[in-house]
Amino acid sequence: MNITSEELLKEARALEPQLQQWRRTLHRHPEVGFDLPHTKELVKKATLPLGEEYQKLLDRAFAERWVDVYENDGKQSGAFSCGVFGVHPYVLMNYAGTLNDAFTLAHELGHSMHSWFSDTTQDYVNHDYRIMVAEVASTVNEVLLTKYLLKTETDEKRRAYILNHFLESFRTTLYRQTLFAEFERKAHDLYAAGQPLTATSLNKVYHDLEATYYDGIGIDADIDPEWSYVPHFYRAFYVYQYATGFSSAVAIAEHILTTGDASGYLKFLTTGGSDYPLEELKIAGVDLTKPDTVRSALRVFDETIDELAKILL
């Protein structure tokens, strides 16, 4: 049975009882382990379209132990890449052998390669790339890994899990961060109109946005205060850059895989902070002054839903 994303949404809206928000991330999937040597090979194979120099740098990162891989007592949780001008980037991870860990390694190495190319091309004043483009290189690697896994995986259940992982990336990065940005704007609008910013008023703003963005499912009141634990709101309008960065990365990866040409993207990686972010992205083939990039990403989102529906329905 073939079903489109529009038909799937229509069915979700018609469900009795209504699909609830808290069930959104529940799924059945096979337990697949990803040991570190296998993950390293996956990341290398997925990024082959980026060329020989990129591959050699990945080899260096692994051989010279740029990555602090495993969990340890007293170690900070999560993962991040730290660029160090004049040396090489360092990556902190807490690798536990899951699919998500494989994507995290690809993601953080994307940051590291961006730092390396910028640091070795630009002077100290211009080496540091800006927040606007910070998540592009990391997400390009995630998209390339997704596409490689889908190309090589034959088990339908595993393919479904990979597709769902990709869709969740869209939801949490493109849609959810845009929701956050709209919430932030509405909070400023309330203040400008002389309205008091109380927990009650901000909860209502957030609830209404959740109901708008996720109109196909039931919204629980427990989600209303979610805004209060988002630290990014202390940096004005930080969050929308996740959505623009993700959209840009999807467009760049699609271009590389379709044309085989990564030259513009590789040049973009060298620019650091030497130009305005919008101008740097144009070098990689992305023009965020036009809607095409976001529309292209949303088209990939629709196509991914259609592909998942063919497996599940």
Which stretches of residues belong to each language-model region?
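Short beta-alpha connecting loops at secondary-structure transitions
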Residues: 90-94, 122-131, 162-169, 188-190, ...
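C-terminal, non-catalytic "cap/extension" segments appended to globular domains
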Residues: 61-70, 105, 113, 143, ...
